[in-house]
Amino acid sequence: MSKNILVCVAWPYASGSRHLGHIGGAYLPADIFARYHRLIGNRVVMVSGSDVHGTPITVRADNEGVEPIEIVNKYHKEFLGYWDKLNIQWDNYTTTMTDNHKKVTQEMFLKIKENGLIEKNKSIQAYDPIENKFLPDRYVEGECPKCNYLEARGDQCDSCGVTLDPEELINPKSKLNGNKAEFKETEHYFLKLSALNDQLSEWLNSKKGWRPHVINFSKSFVEEGLQDRAITRDLDWGVDIPNNELGDGKKIYVWFEAVIGYLSATKEWASNMGDPELWKDFWLDENSESYYFVGKDNVPFHAIIWPSMLMAYGDLNLPTNVPANQYILIKGEKASASRGVGKTLNDYLDEWNPDSLRYALGSILPEQNDSEISENEMIRRNNEELVAAWGNLVQRVFSQYINNFDNLDFDFELIDVDKNILDQANTCFEKTGQFIEKVELKSALQTVMSFVNKINAYLNETEPWKVIKKDNKRGTAILYSALTSIDACASMFTPFMPSTSQMVKNAIVRNTQNNWELNEIKKGAELKNIGHLFKKFD
């Protein structure tokens, strides 16, 4: 029986070009996971969109002397190009600027307020006396009080991952001019996280199979006691506060509003499908599953704050899993768009076949620990694994099959060595599927590539290019078994490398059309020559 699978992916700030860390951290893993579940017959909705209200956008707009909307339009368009080139298959990729998103955000705000878990309170907020304005959290930088990282932001430390308020920073400075930030009292709406502490703790303790760094961080954070958190700010760029009692110059703050995008994007998808009620299948059905693909800096917002908001709202499904990835490191430093660490994604897309790039990233996904990446290692994996192992396997079996087609005799019997390689194909399907369902995608990819090496070993042992010259039936049996195994690999590679895998599958004629099981290749059918799948880097 098929399941409803909601795949929620981090909303990128529409403030700058993306890099490999973003793709390997969230977007590629989500796409692999979603593609697999579609293949096995589950009903999948994968949603995200460009976050247009994040303060990095206004920071960039200020620096460039333009309006925020100009920055948003530029980078949202650029992001759409990424997804197209990388074959990221969204059911809905939208923005937080739509009327639908604003409506859903305001409805959630009012419902939580009605439930008694949003209230007005006074807070101290960073203020720039020279500019005579309150500073959004990301306009403040200083030393982290936890790990002493010198470039911590007013909302979070990129080094240790702790969420912060600007007043907690040591020597806080305004990013507008580098001068010392002052702090003044202002009134805002607060989410009463403290009232949800016990409920959230109980829920976290019930979760099984989460990545250790995600569950351990989340439990530790909650054990310290959740503090009520302001969900509005003194801003002129953001979603309006409904029934605002605070006065002008305040908006709903982005950390509260952006995560609501998962719900608003699903509702938008349902409307696009012609049935506005379809979203309920993924948010109200208790058998539906939801997975949140984010980087580790987003763990507090997706494993703590968003579940708290859902609890405060009531009735909506809580996350099934938050398989957050660690960081991809460039020479030991976290890739960062805002700090210019690492080549942009466009740099790689200009040079790499998208499937080669997906494979290189998929093979080093930082699922448990930070992963160091270098272009030399990516090139090695492309040349040795894609070109020399997988691509060469396809090429030599296809060429032997096509060149000897007139002499093939399909009235053959398989012997033990042939049956063994096909049994291994069945085992590979099972193991690979199990790894993907546990969101252990790197292990899944390694499992398929290991099977590729076993097929190559099978060919080296059986030598069909020699056997076919003196025993047509035996040579045909070997090539048929190898081709069946290649078809299986193409199926299993499909979530990781959809374009080249489909090329292989389109060339093969089958009696069956299984997506995640061994297929029966049609005996006597011609095979299409597809040429080289991948290019070798010098």
Task: Please name every model-derived segment.
Residues M1-G41, V45-S48, N100-V104, I170-N403, ...:
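Structured secondary-structure scaffolds
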